[in-house]
Amino acid sequence: MKLIIFTGLILFPIVSLIEAQAKNEKACLPQYQVCTDAPGNCCSNLICDCYGRYKNGARIGRNCFCLQKGVLYKKEN
């Protein structure tokens, strides 16, 4: 019985450490990927840039994409 409790006490911190490392090492989102639900997950050289969508002057939604820092995007005709 003591061996089971001791084993559990040893395994719990090891499993917790592995899970914490996996969360810290999650893959970042590359350029042009949607980041609406995960704004902090863009790779280090990118930012999550959001744009509102409008129809007849009323806002109908929002789109966010991982884009290069410092780059301006303009609508082309």
From Swiss-Prot:
tRNA-binding listed as a keyword:
no
Propeptide residue interval(s): 21-26
Modification after translation is described as: Contains 4 disulfide bonds.
Question: Which positions carry the signal peptide feature in this UniProt record?
Answer: 1-20
Asked if the record carries the keyword Disulfide bond, the reply is: yes
The record's comment on protein family reads: Belongs to the neurotoxin 19 (CSTX) family. 08 (U8-Lctx) subfamily.
Q: What is this protein called?
A: U8-lycotoxin-Ls1k
